[in-house]
Swiss-Prot record:
<dbReference type="Pfam" id="PF00212">
    <property type="entry name" value="ANP"/>
</dbReference>
<dbReference type="InterPro" id="IPR030480">
    <property type="entry name" value="Natr_peptide_CS"/>
</dbReference>
<keyword id="KW-0732">Signal</keyword>
<comment type="function">
    <text>Exhibits natriuretic and vasodepressor activity. Has a cGMP-stimulating activity.</text>
</comment>
<dbReference type="GO" id="GO:0097746">
    <property type="term" value="P:blood vessel diameter maintenance"/>
</dbReference>
<feature type="propeptide">
    <location>
        <begin position="23"/>
        <end position="96"/>
    </location>
</feature>
<comment type="similarity">
    <text>Belongs to the natriuretic peptide family.</text>
</comment>
<dbReference type="GO" id="GO:0005179">
    <property type="term" value="F:hormone activity"/>
</dbReference>
<dbReference type="GO" id="GO:0007168">
    <property type="term" value="P:receptor guanylyl cyclase signaling pathway"/>
</dbReference>
<feature type="disulfide bond">
    <location>
        <begin position="102"/>
        <end position="118"/>
    </location>
</feature>
<feature type="signal peptide">
    <location>
        <begin position="1"/>
        <end position="22"/>
    </location>
</feature>
<dbReference type="GO" id="GO:0006182">
    <property type="term" value="P:cGMP biosynthetic process"/>
</dbReference>
<dbReference type="GO" id="GO:0005576">
    <property type="term" value="C:extracellular region"/>
</dbReference>
<protein>
    <recommendedName>
        <fullName>C-type natriuretic peptide 2</fullName>
    </recommendedName>
</protein>
<keyword id="KW-0372">Hormone</keyword>
<keyword id="KW-0165">Cleavage on pair of basic residues</keyword>
<dbReference type="InterPro" id="IPR000663">
    <property type="entry name" value="Natr_peptide"/>
</dbReference>
Amino acid sequence: MHFCHIVGWGLVLAVLYLRTEAKPVAQAHQKSLRALLGEELAEYLVSGERGERSIDPKTRARLLRDIRADTRSRAAWTRLLNEHPNSRKIKGINKKGTSKGCFGLKLDRIGAMSGLGC
């Protein structure tokens, strides 16, 4: 039984190894990727293949600016949609304000309800 498990796991590892070998991307896939990314981002793809950085600095600055603006807008939407922006403060106040007595009931005086005290 143990031998079968070892052989089975060996086959699984062999299949995973063969599956993860690096293979070059076909030209058809690369063209469709370039079409999806657009001209500006396709330049990054091409420069990454050659190992060079031949992208215009103005284009790079504009792309980085667009990315930063997107991050800011996401943060604004998060703040806008957040129902309780100060939820930590509210939880802290409520926790102190609704403290329970010794037996699960809030007491005005020690031992007022049970006569035992805490």
